[in-house]
């Protein structure tokens, strides 16, 4: 009977002893990381344009499909240039992101324009112009919009803004919350010429730098990269909740006690 008790105790000890899992990764090659996705130490979303009608964004500062000049530009002698760029992340966001509450989402862009873009001024806008607006979207939800008042035409301007993350904005649920940067502006030109001899007025133009010169930095918290967060487990279980191993161990102890107390009955 004493032998049975010893076996039960040994079983308990085995259950309570942590087992070191083997390194299965040694025999498997890890998939190559997509640098267009966010990662630890890489939290900046960059914008790109092919110079035609396609714009996109991702977390790599360069893209071979973007314009070689790293800049997009539109010109018009007479009339309105209506800018509406939607830099949606491509490829789509694969991981869940946990932003630091109280941290700042920071935008940094370089914009150029010529012509008039202010209604009600001394220019030629009559309700058909608009200031520069840069809007950050979390999927379909608008997170923040920055409006920049007009500056002296014919000059580049570094546009910098920030937004403090709230609890409601903290968790970005991968594909459902794919980030988008939207840039809108309306500038108007009134240049006219008389058979190419007499030229009057000013042409309209819009320019925007891309890649490293056009980005949004996110305060991605380190907890983002944990397996629990990626699995949707955002809070650890309460400390007083017994784990599975503890339950099994308790059962084994009870078995040992039962066997030991049964000894007198067996002797009879």
Annotate each language-model stretch with its function:
Residues 1-29, 236-268:
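Secretory targeting signatures
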Residues 35-36, 124-129, 141, 259-268:
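Long, compositionally biased, intrinsically disordered regions
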């Amino acid at each position: 009977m004493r032998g049975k008790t010893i076996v039960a105790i040994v079983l308990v000890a085995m259950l309570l002893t942590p087992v070191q899992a083997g390194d299965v990764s040694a025999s498997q090659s890890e998939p190559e990381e997509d640098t267009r996705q966010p990662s630890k130490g890489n939290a900046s979303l960059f914008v790109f344009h092919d110079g035609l009608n396609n714009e996109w964004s991702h977390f790599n500062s360069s893209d071979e499909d973007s314009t070689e000049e790293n800049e997009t530009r539109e010109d018009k002698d007479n009339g309105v240039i209506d800018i509406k760029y939607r830099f949606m992340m491509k490829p789509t966001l694969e991981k869940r992101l946990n932003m630091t509450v109280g941290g700042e989402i920071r935008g940094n862009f370089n914009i150029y324009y010529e012509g008039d873009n202010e209604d009600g001024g001394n220019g030629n806008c009559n309700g058909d112009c608009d200031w520069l607006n840069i809007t950050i979207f979390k999927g379909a939800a608008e997170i923040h919009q920055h409006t920049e008042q007009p500056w002296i035409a014919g000059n580049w301007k570094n546009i910098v803004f920030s937004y403090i993350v709230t609890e409601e904005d903290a968790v970005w649920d991968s594909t459902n919350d794919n980030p988008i940067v939207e840039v809108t502006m309306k500038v108007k030109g009134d240049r006219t010429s008389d058979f190419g001899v007499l030229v009057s007025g000013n042409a309209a133009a819009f320019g925007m730098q891309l890649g490293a010169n056009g980005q949004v930095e996110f305060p991605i918290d380190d907890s983002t990269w944990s397996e629990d967060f990626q699995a949707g487990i955002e809070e650890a279980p309460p400390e007083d909740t017994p784990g599975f191993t503890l339950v099994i161990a308790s059962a084994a102890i009870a078995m040992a006690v039962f066997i030991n107390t049964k000894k007198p009955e067996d002797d009879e």
